[in-house]
Regions:
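Compositionally biased, intrinsically disordered low-complexity segments enriched in Pro/Arg/Gln/His
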Residues: 3-5, 22, 28, 50
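Short hydrophobic alpha-helical segments enriched in small aliphatic residues
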Residues: 6, 13, 17, 30, ...
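Residue-identity detector for glycine
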Residues: 8-10, 14-15, 63-64, 74, ...
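Charged/polar low-complexity intrinsically disordered segments
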Residues: 17, 23, 61, 77-78, ...
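Acidic, mature catalytic/reactive cores of soluble proteins
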Residues: 55, 86, 95, 100-106, ...
């Protein structure tokens, strides 16, 4: 098993390498000469009590006394310290790190203000020294049931093979889930919250939602929870869950939604009345790390109702069942005489768990209750749902009286008065028998618990203050911070050994070639990493093209993790040997847009410092794998060899008149405007990568020329010389369309005015005059190629015509086409909504597109909210709503065009308004429209919440923001998955960028402007 965050080397003491605080005790031959190295290592940890405990134990062994060692570490700590808001001196990185002046030695991508914060120092310690600050994090899924990984059915019906009702009793095979949960980065040890209000039929251990067949618009979580705060090392995290005091209406939600048609609204939890009179609890969960292996958990329960109410609060600790096959040692959770739990694991080591005074520890096993589910015999007398049976059903025999197991919960029964709050606390600490037991005994829930918690809150404030433009309103700053918190909470441990899974299904293609099963051709895959999820309930699996967009907001807070995500998708245990990037677990072989080269460029340019060796290594390694992916596209998705690409749905689900992933009802093939434009953009991105690499290795100039040629051949094919009826550009309409090429060789354009026709706008790159001067040989070869292939350039932007500041442009659209496409896009009766660019023109509301095949009528009409069909599961819709990823690429393209045309190009925005804007102003206008979805408007309402009054007016709801999957095409209300902070989290970058950037910045910024930091120093600028 591979881990995403590996622990780097520590100092060498007496010939040994110390990799963790807990290992200090094991070294007996440390020499006095290495005392300074040891002391510097100690400064990586947080509290002086730890420092003294360590010094007391080790000093005699290194030939020094305790006072000398404490004095030395204290002196180094003083030199390395930074002061928090309350004036407390905190341990930071070592003296060596704190006094570095070369930006190349810092954390990749950190701004100088971020670098000065306590959280910035922790990031540096993690990335440079390997201090395991990221080892524990919010890596627990919010839904493991109903996933492909857990599906062992004969028919591939994942939703019904492993249900929510079974989840409390049935052991998972590949992961775990929970409420407000954390785990280590290999998910051996998990911590989460369970609740019971005394009325629910089951213990609330996981979020409830409808399966795909139960919801009138597909799967849908039916809970209210919010990712309020998080830092990139997860030193501070905050999560809020709204728990009704009445019995949770499980049956009502299922039965009512099943009765509703696809044209009706969904029946939501708030519609059931369980929040009437504010009869609910706000359950706030906070985590803070005193050091990487000392984690504090505080659960504060606020009774918002008019009467006192009872609630059972059960912080729960358990091990993922890795011992099911009998080949792995079973870990243990065992109560000691002081009422704490000692957690022992053969890989993770020993930990101690301490809970609030008065808690009763309940123990059981993370084993399936076969008797309940299947009428069989249980392997152990105590099973996974034993704590549920004890709390809800009062069965004292359901938990182990011996105080031992693999799952344990600290049971607190609270009576919370109306309008008041009560708190439960837990502490999880790594144990070293000789050193840390004494520390745990004195510190576990001591006075410093609240000090640590408050300190980490303040440090989180400082970190986000360093990211936030000073000019932002408080509301904008809050939305930006919540978006980034959502990105960080959406990390998940994703475990899937496809080779083993196929063997277990007796469907491995090399061993059982006759059985058909999804993902049979992906048996090379071995996933066991921390990955950014689109939504940890609705989409608790990675989606390749989503992940590329996740890199935009993630790079703002954790550039190293961002690069890790790109490297994962391009690694040999993800990327198919043929070069295809895996799509998602329902079908790894589906085809998503090729945006990973763009994401690689973004991650590179987002690093505000001089690019050093590690950056070039990152680019070089990514480029090699992206070259494989590009070749796969050229060989597999250009069937005619005419540089006109297909690819299927390409992430846009139901946008076409036909299911673009299925065989066409007409026969023939579909030449896709978006697929072809994606490849034009891919070529441009690979060209830019090759040029960057050619600065250190001239051999990449040949590859740069290759991608120049690819771009012009692809772009030229989209609009060939002369007016022909089978090309994608429609001169009469001034728009791009898919072309249906029939078996008899005839062709017709599918005149749907959709996002498909806007994606060619995004295929634009600007080349600086410095690049032309730096590579004279390449420039001459490109010029020679263009002179020999003049026909390719007739309908494209002239690549040899200098623009502002001598820039050259590579674009599918020349100036005339750009104006015509923008006129449509900026028309409020067509694409431009108050909250961004729609995925389908509103003109199709009154004029749906109809295509008839024999007697069957296919139709595409404007649907601003949910889909009215079951295509692609029925829970997404690209026929009208606003989606962030394409809007982001449009904004990026407008900024590129502005860099070339400057202020000389203006256009009416909105179309027909008489108001002329530069392309920078258009980009900012689009960004403002997108951002406005989440901000309070002049009426004090947030468009994202539509007409839901409680979310708009209630002081305990109105400032909590959900980042939905997509948004109503007319009013901006959130639709689809409610926590798809993933690509919707890109709003954070839009808020930050346009909160401080100027047109002059856009004209002169090196690299990609979307990744630009306007106020970084010259030495810190991307090149």
């Amino acid at each position: 098993m591979r881990s995403t965050h590996t622990l780097g080397p520590g100092p060498h003491l007496g010939g040994h390498e110390i990799n963790s605080y807990r290992e200090i005790n094991s070294y007996r031959d440390v020499r006095p000469a290495n005392l300074v190295a040891f002391a510097r290592y100690v400064t990586k940890f947080t509290f002086c009590s730890r420092e003294r405990q360590c010094a007391t134990h080790v000093a005699p062994q290194v030939g020094g006394d305790t006072h000398a060692l404490v004095a030395l570490t204290g002196r180094l700590r003083k030199n390395a310290s930074y002061t928090s808001a309350n004036g407390s001196g905190l341990s930071g990185p070592s003296e060596v790190l704190r006094h570095r002046t070369n930006r190349r030695d810092g954390v990749v991508g950190m701004t100088e203000d971020m670098d000065r914060t306590a959280e910035g120092a922790r990031l540096r310690d993690a990335d440079v020294l390997g201090v395991p600050w990221r080892r524990f994090g919010p890596y627990l899924s919010e839904r493991q049931w109903g996933t492909v990984r857990e599906d062992y059915s004969q028919n591939g019906d994942a939703w019904n093979y492993f249900t929510h009702d079974q989840a409390r009793s049935r052991t998972y095979r590949w992961g775990e889930d929970g409420i407000a949960g954390i785990s280590d980065d290999r998910q051996f040890l998990c911590v989460a919250l369970a609740l019971w209000n005394g009325k629910d039929p089951i213990l609330k251990e996981r979020m409830f939602g409808l399966t795909n067949s139960e919801g009138n618009h597909g799967e849908d979580v039916k809970e209210y929870y919010f990712y309020v705060d998080n830092t990139p090392t997860h030193s501070y995290m905050r999560y809020l869950y709204k728990y009704p005091q009445a019995a949770y209406p499980y049956d009502d939600l299922v039965s009512t939604n099943r009765k509703r048609s696809k044209t009706e609204f969904e029946y939501e939890l708030i519609n059931t009345g369980v929040f009437d009179e504010d009869r609910y609890f706000d359950v706030e969960v906070e985590y803070a790390k005193a050091d990487p292996e000392d984690i504090l958990m505080a659960v504060t329960v606020h009774n918002r109702g008019p009467e006192a109410a009872e609630i059972h609060v059960l912080p729960t600790v358990w091990y993922r069942n890795t011992w099911w096959d009998g080949l792995t040692e079973r870990p243990t959770l065992e109560s000691d005489q002081s009422g704490r739990i000692l957690a022992k694991h053969h890989v993770l080591g020993d930990w101690v768990v301490t809970a609030s005074e008065g808690a009763t520890w309940l123990f059981t096993e993370n084993e399936t209750n076969a008797a309940r589910l299947f009428g069989g015999n249980n392997l152990t007398p105590f099973v996974k749902d034993g704590i549920h049976d004890f709390v809800v059903d009062g069965r004292s025999d359901a938990v182990n009286p011996a105080g031992i197991g693999t799952k344990a919960a600290a049971h607190h029964t609270l009576i919370v008065p109306a309008g008041q709050s009560q708190r439960v606390i837990v502490r999880l600490q790594r144990v070293d028998v000789a050193v840390d037991v004494a520390v745990a005994a004195t510190e576990s829930l001591g006075a410093n618990f609240d000090d640590v918690l408050e300190l980490r809150r303040q440090e989180a404030d400082q970190f986000y203050a360093a990211l936030t433009p000073a000019e932002l309103s408080a509301d904008s700053a809050s939305v930006m911070r919540q978006a980034l918190a959502g990105m960080l909470w959406s990390k998940q441990f994703y475990h899937f050994d496809v080779d083993l899974w196929l063997q277990e299904h007796q469907a491995h293609p090399l061993r059982a070639p006759t059985r058909d099963l999804r993902n049979r051709q992906w048996f090379h895959m071995l996933n066991g990493d921390i990955i950014s999820m689109p939504d940890k309930w609705e989409y608790p699996w990675y989606a390749a093209w989503d992940l590329a967009f996740h890199c935009v907001p993630l790079s703002m807070v954790d550039p190293a993790f961002t690069r890790n995500q790109i490297e994962l998708m391009l690694s040999d245990v993800y990327l198919h040997p043929n070069g295809q990037i895996p799509a998602y677990e329902w079908n790894f072989g589906d085809v998503n847009p090729p945006v990973h080269a763009w994401a690689t460029l973004f991650a590179y340019h987002a690093a505000p410092h001089e690019h050093g060796g590690s950056d070039i290594d990152f680019l070089r390694n990514a480029f090699k794998k992206l070259l494989l992916n590009f070749t796969w596209w050229v060989n597999r998705k250009d069937p005619s060899g005419r540089n006109l690409f297909e690819g299927g749905f390409l992430g846009l689900d139901n946008i076409g008149v036909f299911d673009r992933s299925a065989p066409l009802p007409t026969g023939g093939q579909l030449e896709q405007a978006d697929g072809t434009a994606w490849m034009a953009l891919f070529s441009q991105n690979m060209l830019e990568l090759a040029i960057e690499l050619a600065t250190v290795d001239p051999s990449y100039e040949d590859l740069a020329l290759k991608f120049v040629q690819h771009f012009f051949q692809i772009a030229g094919a989209m609009d060939r010389v002369g007016e022909t009826p089978d090309e994608m550009w429609d001169e009469e309409d001034g728009f791009f369309y898919d072309v249906l090429r029939l078996p008899d060789g005839t062709a017709t354009r599918l005149r749907i005015r959709s996002m498909v026709g806007l994606i060619p706008l995004c295929a634009v790159a600007v080349i600086s005059p410095e690049t032309l001067e730096q590579f004279p040989s390449l420039t001459a070869r490109v010029r020679s190629y263009l002179e020999r292939n003049r026909d390719l350039l007739v309908n494209l932007a002239d690549p040899q015509r200098p623009g502002v500041n001598g820039h050259r442009i590579l674009s599918v659209l020349n100036e005339e086409k750009l104006r015509r496409v923008l006129n449509r896009m900026l028309d409020e009766e067509r694409f431009l909504s108050p909250h961004g660019v729609r995925s389908l023109s509103r003109s199709h509301l009154d004029e749906p597109y109809v295509f008839t095949v024999e007697d069957h009528r296919y139709e595409v009409g404007y649907l601003p909210a949910e889909s009215d069909t079951g295509m692609f599961g029925g829970n997404s819709n690209w026929r009208g709503p606003v989606w962030f990823p394409i809007n982001l690429l449009i904004i990026r393209a407008l900024l590129q065009y502005y860099k070339y045309y400057g202020d000389s190009f203006t256009i009416e925005c909105p179309t027909g308004s008489g108001h002329e804007m530069t392309l920078f102003e258009v980009a900012k206008d689009l960004a403002d429209r997108l951002i406005s979805i989440f901000l309070r408007n002049e009426d004090g309402d947030r468009p994202v919440y539509g007409g839901t009054e409680k979310f708009q007016q209630d002081p305990h709801w109105r400032d909590l923001v959900s980042f939905h999957e997509y948004f109503h095409g007319d009013n901006g209300a959130g639709v689809g998955a409610s926590h798809q902070t993933g690509w919707t989290g890109t709003v954070a970058r839009l808020i930050q960028l346009f909160g401080e950037a100027t047109p002059d910045d856009a004209l002169h910024a090196p690299g990609g402007f979307l990744a630009y930091h306007p106020h970084q120093s010259a030495a810190a600028s991307p090149t």
